[in-house]
Amino acid sequence: MALGIRCFRLLHPAFSSYLADLSRPVSEVPMKTVRGRQRDHIQYSAHPAVPVRQFATKKAKAKGKGQPQARVNINTALVEDIISLEEVDEDMKSVMEALKDNFNKTLNIRTAPGSLDHITVVTADGKLALNQIGQISMKSPQLILVNMASFPECTAAAIKAIRESGMNLNPEVEGTLIRVPIPKVTREHREMLVKLAKQNTNKAKENLRKVRTNAMNKLKKSKDKTSEDTIRLIEKQISQMADDTVAELDRHLAAKTKELLG
């Protein structure tokens, strides 16, 4: 018998610890509670308790983490008396479209006359687009001309606006004629355009946050006459819309960056 136990202990080291517990007095052995099936009474078994938590896996501990959040899809007609989600959606889309427009008109490898059209010029009459006060034309592939003969008093302001447009342009003036040499496409120029694209994207995200904040503030005004569950659901919908727009902004930035860097 002793020889058999010795052999088993060699084969299964864990059993050695178990036998040691069995050799201890009953009073020293942790007791495990077992509820009887036939009668509703408590029985006790004198065998060592096994700490179950030792068998927990990292996968089990991580359960619930990183799980995708359930998306919300509210019928806008049902909550239009609380807030117009369609208007919120339109405002967020406007932010997206403004960034696309900015990318297309100002962030191009090759400078074209059309890229100068919407440069904002600060005049005595307010802010005006450059093409409203000057005639823009392409003199050669390396030179753009801006004729300010119709608004000569705005020539200095136009030069300042072109120089500060972020397009790496250094205009020269001859009377009321502004000459804009087109810079060569260098690696530094490409990287500068990418930097501008990131700055414009961050500004778009700031505008998006304002849209979201305004929507949330408007929603708060309805808390007294709307259930908490409904308010919470609408808040989640608005946040979801904002997150989707941010993701789209990032996708356009990535695409523009790839285009600019070649």
From Swiss-Prot:
One of its GO terms (molecular function) is ribosomal large subunit binding. Belongs to the RRF family. This is Ribosome-recycling factor, mitochondrial. Pfam families: RRF. GO terms for biological process: ribosome disassembly; translation. Keywords: Mitochondrion, Protein biosynthesis, Transit peptide. Responsible for the disassembly of ribosomes from messenger RNA at the termination of mitochondrial protein biosynthesis. Acts in collaboration with GFM2. Promotes mitochondrial ribosome recycling by dissolution of intersubunit contacts. Residues 1-55 form a transit peptide. InterPro entries: Ribosome_recyc_fac, Ribosome_recyc_fac_dom, RRF_sf. The keyword Endoplasmic reticulum does not apply. It is found in: Mitochondrion. One of its GO terms (cellular component) is mitochondrion. The keyword Phosphoprotein does not apply. SUPFAM superfamilies: Ribosome recycling factor, RRF.
